[in-house]
Amino acid sequence: HRKNAGQSRAIRSGILAARAPVIGTLDGDGQNDPADLPDHYRQLTRADAPESLKMVMGRRTKRKDTAWKRFGSTFANNIRKRMLKDDCDDAGCGVKALYRDSFLQLPYFDHIHRYVPALMRADGFDVEYRDVNHRERRTGTSNYTNFGRLADALSDLRGVMWLIRRRRNPGGMDEL
């Protein structure tokens, strides 16, 4: 991108440019450990994985963030988890392995990266969660604050709830 277009746009652009059927994502600040991706890939593509499993997502343990940031994240995750019923404890974790075609079926909007598990489930897909490492930030500064994220999060949450209520899962398609 010629200018910063946000995390969700960066993820979508990368996935659009990719050609592999399975995509791995990480945040760009160095806090996610790339060593976690092979495990996610193996879980997603294992022989006994249900056909409906389309994403394996990280759940950060031993977070290397301030107590205030951890509090804000836990508070927000509990609200969104309760409202969206997606069982996602850590929507902000960037470590994901997912099927490209399943992700591209989702409606795009800014900040979608926090709602991918809920939207995947609304489309009838399964999502699994795995514990991942979390490291000190190695580059850049956070563009988020607890209060700054709150207004966007409340608006986005209402929008995602609206989208989910209106999505019709056909339960698959058969060729005629």
Task: Pin down the residues of each PLM region.
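Acceptor/aglycone-binding surface of glycosyltransferases and processive sugar-polymer synthases
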Residues: 2-17, 22-25, 34-114, 135-162, ...
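Juxtamembrane C-terminal module of membrane proteins
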Residues: 167-176
